[in-house]
Amino acid sequence: MKIHKHAPMNGVIHIPGDKSISHRSVMFGAIANGTTVVKNFLPGADCLSTIDCFRKMGVDIEQKGTDVVIHGKGLKELKEPSDVLDVGNSGTTIRLMMGILAGCEFHSTLIGDESIAKRPMQRVTGPLKQLGAKIDGRANGEYTPLSIRGGHLKGISYESPVASAQIKSAVLLAGLQAEGTTTLTEPHKSRDHTERMLSMFGVKLDEDEQSVSIEGGQTLKATDIFVPGDISSAAFFLVAGSIVPNSRIVLKNVGLNKTRTGIIDVLKQMGANLEINEVDAKGGEPYGDLTISTSSLKGIEISGDVISRLIDEIPIIALLATQAEGTTIIKDAAELKVKETNRIDTVVSELKKLGADIEATEDGMKIHGKTPLQGGAVVSSYGDHRIGMMLGIAACITKQAVEIEDTDAVRVSYPNFFEHIEYLTKTV
């Protein structure tokens, strides 16, 4: 796809439903007793993979666009799949599914695409094995395909070496099926969508700032879920509104969960002109309307605990930093190396092609601004949706046209991303 320099971005858009919450709404609805209705579901490729996996285990799921109805019969009624469970490109699906399957008394095999085959799973299979799950795979359970035979689990206390919502969620979902209490402690709090939604489904948890405990044997009761807009998707247009001259964009019903709003903190610190109007907190998840307009920005250091609250937004933050006066340093973000791509390397290589003054570091990157981006280059998403969208926004401020390869990757989390660019600028 070739994108030319655009006019100012102005308008009101509804950001697609949150990917993390959409995944969990299907998973928890599938293992609950009763019918769960989900509104504003994200019909992206990743979340559709989650639906497909549960259908293969006998769960009746109706999906029409952003509406999903899940007819759950409880954990014990999941059926042994006759085929492999293919998670596609979805790391959330495979890691949370492992937690569910760890306690199911049948055999299952999890596979994914080429990207998933390269992503490390030991960080999840390790604690699940401690609970008693039988999991095997390439490199002793490090890589897919993963073979799981669930069964009797016993609660554990586990200290996670990293703050990861996927590790935490997998352990809690296994702990739900274990004998006794399971406790997970992490270095600092990761996103808490699992805890919020389990509570919505009637599960009791014991939480403090860095740990969460769950008592095994609890059952989930069906409920209705409203999925707010995904702040990780909103981040692309928050940055666009900040750096495209003479722009003003309103983003409706965006999730404002405090464990996800690191991008808002960074924008404010850099001097962005951002207004927040909190609207509601349906389903335990706060959301509101965000208004962003063009402003002068300054470079900052981004490191420490905030990284886990904005890890998925770092590619677009890197673009933001190219248009800020001074140097922006991103540290403590080595987790980027094991995403859909090595996002440190891909962000640096692709932005350099456009003329950015950016360099990779061991655990992040250093960006010197303010730098006019030239464009006139061919860049690629390398199959990574967040890289593809970052490049789409970058092309809105380059002096020359930019050709982006593999733009289909954005369908994973934001199927109408380029349509929203077209609407806001009236040209693509």
Swiss-Prot record:
Reaction it catalyzes: 3-phosphoshikimate + phosphoenolpyruvate = 5-O-(1-carboxyvinyl)-3-phosphoshikimate + phosphate
Function of this protein?
A: Catalyzes the transfer of the enolpyruvyl moiety of phosphoenolpyruvate (PEP) to the 5-hydroxyl of shikimate-3-phosphate (S3P) to produce enolpyruvyl shikimate-3-phosphate and inorganic phosphate.
- Identify the SUPFAM superfamilies for this entry: EPT/RTPC-like (SSF55205)
Q: Name one GO cellular component term.
A: cytoplasm
Pathway(s) this gene product operates in, as recorded in its UniProt entry: Metabolic intermediate biosynthesis; chorismate biosynthesis; chorismate from D-erythrose 4-phosphate and phosphoenolpyruvate: step 6/7
What is annotated as the active site? 312
Complex formation: Monomer.
- Please tell me whether the keyword Amino-acid biosynthesis is annotated for this protein: yes
Protein name per Swiss-Prot or TrEMBL:
3-phosphoshikimate 1-carboxyvinyltransferase
Subcellular location, record wording = Cytoplasm
Residue sites binding 3-phosphoshikimate per the record: 19-20, 24, 164, 166, 312, 339
Keyword line: Amino-acid biosynthesis, Aromatic amino acid biosynthesis, Cytoplasm, Transferase
Give an example GO biological process.
aromatic amino acid family biosynthetic process
Kind of enzyme, top EC level?
A: transferase
Database matches in InterPro entries? Enolpyruvate_Tfrase_dom, Enolpyruvate_Tfrase_sf, EPSP_synthase, EPSP_synthase_CS, RNA3'P_cycl/enolpyr_Trfase_a/b
Q: Where does phosphoenolpyruvate bind?
A: 19, 91, 119, 166, 343, 386
Query: In the record, what terms sit under GO molecular function?
Result: 3-phosphoshikimate 1-carboxyvinyltransferase activity
Q: Which Pfam families match?
A: EPSP_synthase (PF00275)
Q: What is its main location?
A: cytoplasm
Q: Report the Gene3D superfamilies cross-referenced here.
A: Enolpyruvate transferase domain (3.65.10.10)
Q: Which organism is it from?
A: Bacillus pumilus (strain SAFR-032)
Family statement: Belongs to the EPSP synthase family.
Cite the EC number: 2.5.1.19
Q: Which gene encodes it?
A: aroA
